[in-house]
């Protein structure tokens, strides 16, 4: 079975690496163009490109997978199936109709819930207790195709984005191998999604990152862990925008929203609308992430200071 893999970030790269190491015939890769990354804004290859180069798999990086040059590449490698994981761009009908077995997407949510670009973050932000991975046959509509395989896992109360993403990558690897073995033998049963139950996970905007400490402690906890460690939840100390990481506890005893009540080696207790949360790490502009205790000892922060919310979603 000839496979073309389409993806961009680390989530997709780990799945591609797993496919190749398990002996599957990956005949081509499509990933997004290289972009400036990190503090120095140096142009770096996408994680998927790095895997393709490592294993000498032919790859392209088109601005659009739907343009003539990309379609010619896809036709030239003659895929039986196209596997998509976190590509970040829409596949048009010409691409979807190209492989004889179809195009299948690996989506890290329990579809039809959380269709869209940011399912892991939205699951955490909304305090969901369960999530999972869905492999579905792609259609023109976003994340709306019939389901080939779906498995679920529980979400731990203080689990961060990084931690949950790692578990979902491992689940995706296992599921993709199972799916491809079934596809080889024609043993795939597709189940239509219940579109009436669809919810959406839109792309993250900068205002989504801002913590509103006037909300309840559970909501504040969920906001911070949803963006831990990247790109980091934001709050303001005076005119300074900082990032917050590592919520370790919540408490129902009241305090003023945003007020830094107490700092010890384990973190800072910060007031919310109905209690307080304990946050371990803070990052100031141009500095590395540090504990609140380190920030206090460095005279960057003291008890009695207050976090604010500066722009509205």
UniProtKB/Swiss-Prot annotation:
Cite the NCBIfam families for this sequence.
fmt
Question: What would be the name of the gene that encodes this protein?
Answer: fmt
Q: Which CDD domains match?
A: FMT_core_Met-tRNA-FMT_N, Met_tRNA_FMT_C
| Family designation | Belongs to the Fmt family.
Task: Please give one Pfam family short name.
Answer: Formyl_trans_C
Q: Could you tell me what this protein does?
A: Attaches a formyl group to the free amino group of methionyl-tRNA(fMet). The formyl group appears to play a dual role in the initiator identity of N-formylmethionyl-tRNA by promoting its recognition by IF2 and preventing the misappropriation of this tRNA by the elongation apparatus.
* Residues annotated as binding (6S)-5,6,7,8-tetrahydrofolate: 109-112
Q: Which HAMAP family match?
A: Formyl_trans
Q: Name the chain's protein.
A: Methionyl-tRNA formyltransferase
EC number(s): the record gives 2.1.2.9
Q: Which GO terms describe its molecular function?
A: methionyl-tRNA formyltransferase activity
Q: Which UniProt keywords apply?
A: Protein biosynthesis, Transferase
Q: Which reaction does it catalyse?
A: L-methionyl-tRNA(fMet) + (6R)-10-formyltetrahydrofolate = N-formyl-L-methionyl-tRNA(fMet) + (6S)-5,6,7,8-tetrahydrofolate + H(+)
Q: What's one GO BP annotation on this UniProt entry?
A: conversion of methionyl-tRNA to N-formyl-methionyl-tRNA
């Amino acid at each position: 079975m000839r496979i073309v893999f389409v993806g961009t970030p680390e989530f997709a790269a780990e799945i591609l690496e797993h496919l190749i190491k398990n002996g599957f015939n990956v005949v081509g890769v499509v990933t997004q163009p290289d972009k400036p990354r990190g503090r120095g804004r140096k142009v770096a290859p996408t994680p998927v490109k790095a895997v393709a180069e490592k294993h000498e798999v032919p790859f392209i990086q088109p601005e659009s997978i739907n343009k003539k040059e990309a379609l010619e590449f896809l036709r030239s490698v003659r895929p039986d199936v196209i596997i998509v994981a976190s590509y970040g761009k829409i596949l048009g009908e010409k691409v979807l109709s190209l492989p004889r077995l179809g195009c299948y997407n690996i989506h890290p949510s329990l579809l039809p819930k959380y269709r869209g670009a940011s399912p892991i973050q939205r699951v955490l932000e909304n305090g969901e207790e369960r999530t999972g991975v869905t492999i579905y046959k792609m259609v023109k509509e976003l994340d709306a195709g019939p389901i080939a395989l779906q498995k679920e896992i529980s979400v731990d109360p203080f689990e961060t984005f990084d931690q949950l993403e790692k578990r979902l990558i491992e689940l995706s690897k296992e599921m993709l191998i199972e799916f491809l073995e079934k596809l080889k033998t024609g043993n795939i049963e597709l189940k239509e999604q219940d579109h009436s139950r669809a919810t959406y996970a839109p792309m993250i905007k900068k205002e989504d990152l801002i913590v509103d400490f006037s909300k309840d402690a559970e909501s504040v906890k969920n906001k911070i862990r949803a963006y831990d460690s990247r790109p980091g939840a934001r709050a303001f100390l005076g005119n300074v925008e900082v990032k917050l990481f590592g919520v370790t506890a919540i408490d129902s005893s009241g305090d003023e929203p945003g007020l830094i009540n107490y700092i010890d080696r384990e973190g800072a207790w910060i007031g919310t609308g109905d209690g307080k949360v304990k946050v371990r790490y803070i990052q100031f502009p141009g500095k590395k992430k540090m504990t609140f205790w380190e920030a206090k000892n460095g005279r960057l922060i003291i008890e009695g200071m207050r976090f604010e919310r500066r722009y509205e979603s």
